[in-house]
Amino acid sequence: MDTWKVGPVELKSRLILGSGKYKDFGVMREAIAAAKAEVVTVSIRRVELKAPGHVGLLEALEGVRLLPNTAGARTAEEAVRLARLGRLLTGERWVKLEVIPDPTYLLPDPLETLKAAERLIEEDFLVLPYMGPDLVLAKRLAALGTATVMPLAAPIGSGWGVRTRALLELFAREKASLPPVVVDAGLGLPSHAAEVMELGLDAVLVNTAIAEAQDPPAMAEAFRLAVEAGRKAYLAGPMRPREAASPSSPVEGVPFTPTGPRPGRGPQ
């Protein structure tokens, strides 16, 4: 069985789902079932404030492992407070750390993220930090002891796909020195998830692309299959691209095979 771990938690599914933006809890539960997701993120701030669409959310997610997140935190201090509240509400030790002061592009603050991660680890949290695709920051977080690193593929909710591929490839090269790498944010299509998994990264987190689809359960299934296909492709050892064409069938001894000099090479 090809499993992976977040701290001591062993998981089979490499697709984590978010719980926001669904039209109702029934559709959300159907999508979770279709994705065969074991872990679903939940915004503690919205649950605690009883925001529209979040009343009764924890009850609706019964039977699924919850990953509280600190969405809405703009500073390390706010993130730490939300993480503590999340532990009280869910009983879970782990937390998806989000520190986002920028309301326009929703890009994470690297300095506040690092500061919050250090404090939360001191308080015995398993920290899963959302971050930009910055390998140096990832190694700093890993040195602190975070359970994962979660670089973005594109801005949250954009659906742009893997705009940061070149930087994510660096994460793939350096995986031996990193905790599990979960690509979070910006994936809009199942093919985007497959692309990430083909790099050899550990998992993806998807919310908007599924919740805003015309048929969320069907899209959730499509993402599940794409994640599985991408992972299998990576494990199968893909061929390396070549600079020139290479025939799939031998040409030696085939009737009418040219025997003269090849174009551009001159007399032999």
From Swiss-Prot:
Metabolic or biological pathway: Cofactor biosynthesis; thiamine diphosphate biosynthesis
Pfam name, any one: ThiG
Species the sequence originates in: Thermus thermophilus (strain ATCC BAA-163 / DSM 7039 / HB27)
Any one Gene Ontology BP term: thiamine diphosphate biosynthetic process
Domain of life, source organism: Bacteria
EC class of the enzyme, as a word: transferase
Function: Catalyzes the rearrangement of 1-deoxy-D-xylulose 5-phosphate (DXP) to produce the thiazole phosphate moiety of thiamine. Sulfur is provided by the thiocarboxylate moiety of the carrier protein ThiS. In vitro, sulfur can be provided by H(2)S.
InterPro entries (alphabetical): Aldolase_TIM, Thiazole_synthase_ThiG, ThiG
Annotated stretches, region: Disordered: 238-268
The name this protein goes by in its record: Thiazole synthase
Entry's EC annotation: 2.8.1.10
Family statement drawn from the similarity comment of this UniProt entry: Belongs to the ThiG family.
Subunit organization: Homotetramer. Forms heterodimers with either ThiH or ThiS.
Catalytic activity: [ThiS sulfur-carrier protein]-C-terminal-Gly-aminoethanethioate + 2-iminoacetate + 1-deoxy-D-xylulose 5-phosphate = [ThiS sulfur-carrier protein]-C-terminal Gly-Gly + 2-[(2R,5Z)-2-carboxy-4-methylthiazol-5(2H)-ylidene]ethyl phosphate + 2 H2O + H(+)
HAMAP family in the record: ThiG (MF_00443)
Record's keyword terms, sorted: Cytoplasm, Schiff base, Thiamine biosynthesis, Transferase
Gene Ontology molecular-function annotations: thiazole synthase activity
Record localization: Cytoplasm
